[in-house]
């Protein structure tokens, strides 16, 4: 790895010590995904310092109208933006009236963040002294299930290190999100419904222009010292957010553990209503519980590594780097869905846009051919075949006829959507890359 603060380790990315100047970088490096959804490694708790919030759904995009000083023949009408989706990870902690916020805390000790590539787990732990003097120990574990790709899970533990304290836990969803990367500062999302029932909450939203109908959901369980269930004292509903508030009194050594299950469901993937789909998924998640879901997820990663691992002896940084590449490829694209492809930044952020570049055929397909069942590479080629008519339309815009096809430089649905005209039409090798992949 070329980030000097990342500790060399054969199977993990490890960061030790809290430095606010590294937060955004680490949010990218420690990102997680399961092909259907992904997220930057944002903190679950409130953070008032510089951060780049990002959660994403595979294949969901917005056609952001092109912004140029002059128009040229064949110039794409829009750039397909990867959408920052409603966030489901929020677990805000308040102790004796003081927010848990690493940016304003009096002291932060023993901060450690680890991305376990072998098991697909994102772990974080630290001790903190809040501005009001309260001392806490925090441990969090998070993953997006490879075994059930509509389910993500968080285990978040707060231990009081001394004294006594009243604690509040706010578990919530937030659809008041925006893309930092926007040509015209358009609203990409429209929230259509906000609801909460018992320990479950959900927000229905759809994208403007492309009309992807989605639901973001959560189910929360809170326990005091693993045994006593803490029930929500209040349901919080707003136009763009919904959640539950939990309260407890702690003495020194007590631990409050929050289990949170969340994720996204697209209407095109279900036959009934989105609300019915939420309660079906929540039922599966809560019935299984965090540990069983984690085990199934780790087993799915084990099956991947059994076929895809590359061992480099004598250079731990090189070993770490190649496994990071393998990890990112597999959490970006699993091969289950022929409507998805391999975005250039995976689920690390919204910049660069687009879902599909020629890199898929030139560089990625050989990897999947060597490490996956053949249907995975076949699905990537099926994706291009399904967009052949759009490639013919694209060629026609440039004066070609008789069935000539020019595949786009960048696309989400088969239409060209790269905003740089010169790059779009100089990089004509993309047809050759696709032909090369078919040959292979």
Where are the model-predicted features located?
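Beta-sandwich/jelly-roll carbohydrate-recognition scaffolds of carbohydrate-active enzymes
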Residues: 2-323
């Amino acid at each position: 790895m070329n980030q000097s603060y990342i500790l060399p380790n054969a199977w993990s990315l490890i960061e030790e010590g809290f430095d606010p100047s590294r937060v955004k970088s680490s949010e990218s490096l420690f990102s997680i995904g399961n092909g259907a959804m992904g997220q930057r490694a944002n903190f679950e708790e409130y953070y008032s310092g510089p951060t780049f919030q990002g959660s994403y759904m595979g294949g969901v995009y917005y056609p952001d109208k092109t912004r140029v000083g002059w128009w040229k023949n064949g110039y794409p009408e829009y750039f397909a933006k990867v959408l920052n989706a409603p966030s489901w990870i929020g677990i805000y902690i308040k102790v004796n009236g003081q927010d848990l916020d690493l940016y304003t805390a009096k002291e932060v000790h023993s901060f450690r963040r680890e991305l376990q590539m072998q098991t697909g787990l994102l772990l974080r732990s630290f001790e903190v002294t809040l501005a009001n003097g309260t001392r806490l120990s925090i441990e969090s574990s998070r993953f997006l299930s490879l075994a059930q790709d509509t389910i993500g899970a968080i285990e978040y533990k707060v231990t009081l290190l001394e004294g006594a304290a009243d604690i509040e836990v706010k578990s919530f969803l937030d659809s008041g999100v925006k893309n930092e990367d926007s040509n015209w500062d358009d609203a990409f999302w429209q929230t259509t419904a906000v609801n909460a029932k018992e320990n479950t909450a959900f927000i229905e939203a759809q994208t403007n222009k492309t009309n992807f109908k989605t639901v973001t959901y959560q189910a929360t369980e809170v326990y005091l010292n693993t045994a006593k269930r803490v029930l929500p004292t209040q349901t919080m509903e707003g136009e763009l957010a919904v959640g539950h508030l939990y309260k407890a009194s702690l003495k020194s050594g007590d631990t409050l553990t929050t289990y949170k299950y969340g994720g996204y469901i697209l209407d095109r993937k279900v036959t009934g209503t989105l609300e019915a789909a939420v309660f079906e998924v929540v039922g599966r998640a809560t019935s299984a519980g965090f540990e069983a879901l984690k085990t199934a997820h780790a087993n799915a990663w084990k099956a991947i590594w059994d076929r895809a691992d590359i061992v480099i002896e004598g250079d731990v940084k090189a070993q770490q780097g190649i496994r990071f590449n393998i990890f990112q490829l597999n959490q970006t694209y699993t091969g289950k869905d022929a409507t998805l492809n391999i975005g250039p930044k995976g689920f690390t952020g919204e910049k660069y846009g687009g879902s599909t570049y020629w890199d898929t055929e030139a560089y990625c397909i050989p990897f999947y051919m060597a490490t996956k069942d053949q249907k995975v590479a076949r699905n990537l080629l099926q994706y291009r075949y399904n967009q052949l008519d759009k490639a013919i339309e694209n060629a026609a815009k440039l004066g070609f006829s008789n069935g000539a096809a020019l595949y786009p430089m960048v696309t989400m649905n088969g239409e060209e959507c790269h905003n740089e005209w010169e790059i779009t039409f100089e990089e004509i090798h993309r047809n050759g890359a696709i032909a090369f992949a078919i040959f292979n």
